[in-house]
Protein backbone atom coordinates (compact mmCIF):
# COMPACT_ATOMS: atom_id res chain seq x y z
CA UNK A 1 0.00 0.00 0.00
CA UNK A 2 1.33 3.39 -1.02
CA UNK A 3 0.59 6.90 0.22
CA UNK A 4 1.98 9.97 -1.48
CA UNK A 5 1.48 12.62 1.20
CA UNK A 6 1.73 16.35 0.64
CA UNK A 7 1.63 19.02 3.31
CA UNK A 8 -0.92 21.56 2.13
CA UNK A 9 -2.29 24.95 3.10
CA UNK A 10 -5.58 23.81 1.56
CA UNK A 11 -6.83 21.13 -0.80
CA UNK A 12 -10.08 20.02 -2.39
CA UNK A 13 -11.40 17.35 -4.71
CA UNK A 14 -14.24 17.83 -7.18
CA UNK A 15 -16.28 15.23 -9.07
CA UNK A 16 -18.63 16.40 -11.84
CA UNK A 17 -18.52 20.00 -10.57
CA UNK A 18 -19.37 18.90 -7.00
CA UNK A 19 -16.83 19.35 -4.20
CA UNK A 20 -16.66 15.97 -2.42
CA UNK A 21 -13.90 16.86 0.02
CA UNK A 22 -12.13 20.01 1.17
CA UNK A 23 -9.60 20.80 3.90
CA UNK A 24 -7.57 23.71 5.17
CA UNK A 25 -4.06 23.08 6.52
CA UNK A 26 -3.15 19.40 6.67
CA UNK A 27 -2.28 16.48 4.43
CA UNK A 28 -3.39 15.50 0.97
CA UNK A 29 -3.03 11.71 0.87
CA UNK A 30 -2.99 10.06 -2.56
CA UNK A 31 -3.58 6.37 -1.81
CA UNK A 32 -2.62 3.44 -4.04
CA UNK A 33 -3.61 -0.14 -3.24
CA UNK A 34 -1.50 -3.05 -4.47
CA UNK A 35 -2.43 -6.72 -5.03
CA UNK A 36 -1.03 -8.10 -1.78
CA UNK A 37 -2.37 -5.35 0.46
CA UNK A 38 -4.61 -6.16 3.42
CA UNK A 39 -6.10 -4.55 6.53
CA UNK A 40 -2.84 -5.00 8.45
CA UNK A 41 -0.96 -2.94 5.85
CA UNK A 42 -3.74 -0.34 5.85
CA UNK A 43 -3.47 -0.07 9.65
CA UNK A 44 0.31 0.37 9.46
CA UNK A 45 0.09 2.95 6.68
CA UNK A 46 -2.59 4.92 8.53
CA UNK A 47 -0.38 4.93 11.62
CA UNK A 48 2.57 6.18 9.57
CA UNK A 49 0.59 8.86 7.70
CA UNK A 50 -1.03 10.29 10.83
CA UNK A 51 2.15 10.00 12.88
CA UNK A 52 4.63 11.31 10.29
CA UNK A 53 6.24 14.44 11.73
CA UNK A 54 6.34 16.90 8.83
CA UNK A 55 4.82 20.00 10.44
CA UNK A 56 6.94 22.67 12.10
CA UNK A 57 7.14 23.08 15.86
CA UNK A 58 7.72 26.40 17.68
CA UNK A 59 11.40 26.32 16.68
CA UNK A 60 10.63 25.72 13.01
CA UNK A 61 11.73 22.07 12.99
CA UNK A 62 9.66 19.33 11.36
CA UNK A 63 8.64 17.78 14.64
CA UNK A 64 4.82 17.65 14.69
CA UNK A 65 2.40 15.23 13.07
CA UNK A 66 -0.84 16.34 11.41
CA UNK A 67 -2.90 15.83 14.57
CA UNK A 68 -0.45 17.76 16.76
CA UNK A 69 -0.49 20.57 14.18
CA UNK A 70 -4.30 20.72 14.25
CA UNK A 71 -4.58 19.76 10.59
CA UNK A 72 -6.99 17.68 8.54
CA UNK A 73 -6.58 14.90 5.99
CA UNK A 74 -7.96 14.63 2.45
CA UNK A 75 -7.69 11.04 1.15
CA UNK A 76 -7.91 10.49 -2.62
CA UNK A 77 -7.66 7.09 -4.29
CA UNK A 78 -5.02 6.94 -7.02
CA UNK A 79 -4.46 3.55 -8.64
CA UNK A 80 -1.62 4.91 -10.79
CA UNK A 81 0.66 4.88 -7.72
CA UNK A 82 0.73 1.08 -8.03
CA UNK A 83 2.02 1.24 -11.61
CA UNK A 84 5.08 -0.69 -12.71
CA UNK A 85 7.24 1.87 -14.54
CA UNK A 86 10.50 -0.05 -14.71
CA UNK A 87 10.36 -0.87 -18.43
CA UNK A 88 9.03 0.58 -21.63
CA UNK A 89 7.16 3.77 -22.32
CA UNK A 90 3.77 2.70 -20.99
CA UNK A 91 2.97 1.92 -17.34
CA UNK A 92 1.68 -1.50 -16.36
CA UNK A 93 -1.00 -1.70 -13.69
CA UNK A 94 -0.59 -5.42 -13.01
CA UNK A 95 0.64 -4.69 -9.46
CA UNK A 96 -2.59 -2.90 -8.54
CA UNK A 97 -5.34 -4.54 -6.53
CA UNK A 98 -8.60 -5.53 -8.22
CA UNK A 99 -11.07 -2.61 -8.09
CA UNK A 100 -13.42 -4.20 -5.54
CA UNK A 101 -10.54 -5.08 -3.19
CA UNK A 102 -8.91 -1.67 -3.69
CA UNK A 103 -12.16 0.12 -2.86
CA UNK A 104 -12.67 -1.96 0.29
CA UNK A 105 -9.14 -1.18 1.51
CA UNK A 106 -9.49 2.50 0.57
CA UNK A 107 -12.69 2.72 2.63
CA UNK A 108 -11.00 0.80 5.46
CA UNK A 109 -8.06 3.25 5.45
CA UNK A 110 -10.45 6.23 5.59
CA UNK A 111 -12.39 4.62 8.46
CA UNK A 112 -9.14 4.03 10.38
CA UNK A 113 -8.21 7.71 9.99
CA UNK A 114 -11.60 8.72 11.34
CA UNK A 115 -11.32 6.26 14.23
CA UNK A 116 -8.16 8.11 15.26
CA UNK A 117 -10.33 11.24 15.67
CA UNK A 118 -8.77 12.74 12.58
CA UNK A 119 -10.90 15.17 10.57
CA UNK A 120 -10.93 13.27 7.27
CA UNK A 121 -12.40 14.23 3.91
CA UNK A 122 -12.37 12.10 0.76
CA UNK A 123 -12.61 11.97 -2.96
CA UNK A 124 -14.83 9.41 -4.69
CA UNK A 125 -13.30 6.02 -5.46
CA UNK A 126 -12.70 5.34 -9.19
CA UNK A 127 -14.22 8.68 -10.21
CA UNK A 128 -12.67 11.16 -12.61
CA UNK A 129 -11.61 13.77 -10.06
CA UNK A 130 -10.13 17.23 -10.16
CA UNK A 131 -7.76 17.72 -7.24
CA UNK A 132 -6.71 21.24 -6.28
CA UNK A 133 -4.08 22.01 -3.69
CA UNK A 134 -1.74 24.63 -2.38
CA UNK A 135 1.42 22.74 -1.46
CA UNK A 136 3.03 24.04 1.72
CA UNK A 137 6.80 23.98 1.37
CA UNK A 138 6.57 22.03 -0.87
CA UNK A 139 6.76 19.03 1.43
CA UNK A 140 5.98 15.69 -0.23
CA UNK A 141 6.77 12.13 0.91
CA UNK A 142 6.25 8.64 -0.52
CA UNK A 143 5.28 6.13 2.18
CA UNK A 144 4.99 2.44 1.36
CA UNK A 145 4.23 -0.57 3.57
Curated annotation (Swiss-Prot):
One of its GO terms (cellular component) is cytoplasm. It is an enzyme of class 3 (hydrolase). The keyword Plastid does not apply. Its EC number is 3.1.1.96. Gene3D superfamilies: D-tyrosyl-tRNA(Tyr) deacylase. A motif (Gly-cisPro motif, important for rejection of L-amino acids) lies at residues 137-138. InterPro entries: Daa-tRNA_deacyls_DTD, DTD-like_sf. It is found in: Cytoplasm. It holds the Pfam family Tyr_Deacylase. It catalyses: glycyl-tRNA(Ala) + H2O = tRNA(Ala) + glycine + H(+); a D-aminoacyl-tRNA + H2O = a tRNA + a D-alpha-amino acid + H(+). GO terms for molecular function: D-tyrosyl-tRNA(Tyr) deacylase activity; Gly-tRNA(Ala) deacylase activity; Ser(Gly)-tRNA(Ala) hydrolase activity; tRNA binding. GO terms for biological process: D-amino acid catabolic process. Keywords: Cytoplasm, Hydrolase, RNA-binding, tRNA-binding. A Gly-cisPro motif from one monomer fits into the active site of the other monomer to allow specific chiral rejection of L-amino acids. Homodimer. An aminoacyl-tRNA editing enzyme that deacylates mischarged D-aminoacyl-tRNAs. Also deacylates mischarged glycyl-tRNA(Ala), protecting cells against glycine mischarging by AlaRS. Acts via tRNA-based rather than protein-based catalysis; rejects L-amino acids rather than detecting D-amino acids in the active site. By recycling D-aminoacyl-tRNA to D-amino acids and free tRNA molecules, this enzyme counteracts the toxicity associated with the formation of D-aminoacyl-tRNA entities in vivo and helps enforce protein L-homochirality. PANTHER family: D-AMINOACYL-TRNA DEACYLASE 1, D-TYROSYL-TRNA TYR DEACYLASE. Belongs to the DTD family. This is D-aminoacyl-tRNA deacylase. It comes from Klebsiella pneumoniae subsp. pneumoniae (strain ATCC 700721 / MGH 78578). The lineage of its organism: Bacteria, Pseudomonadati, Pseudomonadota, Gammaproteobacteria, Enterobacterales. The gene is dtd.
